[in-house]
């Protein structure tokens, strides 16, 4: 059975690593060209988009935002910044109102500097931080800039010191770090109790399936795959209308365009990728506009000659 290119939106179960999911999909679809769009910690459940075939080349062009719903437990600090780690300190937490707690959360909204957890996949001197941490090595991670587009306080249980938040953020944001840092701001401690990713890279739960769904219906596995072009709806399209243009494109040559068309159409930006398609809406690749030369220059070409 020939595998269809595109994206599977896996609703990952607890305890399964992102790499485990990729291995299972490779086996189920009998194809090697499979990759995920970003690591989801084993204890985190929810959306894990997986690219199949040529779709792996388009991962960088997907929307990068992600949305989580998480619970934070105040009063506890662990070596992993989540409840599954070793407890290293415990303190009481302030019995403050929802409004006051939301004011403290303001410090995490917008563009912020965040130090990743030491048990994380961040590279330090060519090695993953979690490997150094498991060897009890002493090291520091540098703060990184991340963007929190939305942070909503959904519930606050003063008695048990548990809050539930919804976070829409940039790739590379650690909700565990928010839990840890919120505890410090409140003159307490904090760790992540549980976390669910409800959207990633433009996909959400409505598109999602369990790996068990594929196992039950392998013959119709193609029906679960979202075409690559559908995952790129956020990118402006340019249609190659002649065979000559398509041949130019597939041989890696720039496409001459009427620059007035782009100047009149405000959806195009020379800094942003352009989705190149043919008249039948078949995806041909990704290009970038060169205003000075009135060209679309190929960046990614499918079916190159």
From Swiss-Prot:
SUPFAM superfamilies: Pseudouridine synthase (SSF55120)
PANTHER family noted in UniProt: PSEUDOURIDYLATE SYNTHASE TRUB1, TRNA-PSEUDOURIDINE SYNTHASE
InterPro entries, per the entry: PsdUridine_synth_cat_dom_sf (IPR020103), PsdUridine_synth_N (IPR002501), tRNA_psdUridine_synth_TruB (IPR014780)
Pfam (any one): TruB_N
Family: Belongs to the pseudouridine synthase TruB family. Type 1 subfamily.
GO BP: any one term: tRNA pseudouridine synthesis
EC number, UniProt record: 5.4.99.25
Function: Responsible for synthesis of pseudouridine from uracil-55 in the psi GC loop of transfer RNAs.
Main enzyme class: isomerase
Substrates-to-products reaction catalysed: uridine(55) in tRNA = pseudouridine(55) in tRNA
Keyword Isomerase (UniProt): yes
Name assigned to this protein: tRNA pseudouridine synthase B
GO molecular function: RNA binding; tRNA pseudouridine(55) synthase activity
Assigned keywords, A-Z: Isomerase, tRNA processing
Active site per database record: 41
Highest rank taxon of the organism: Bacteria
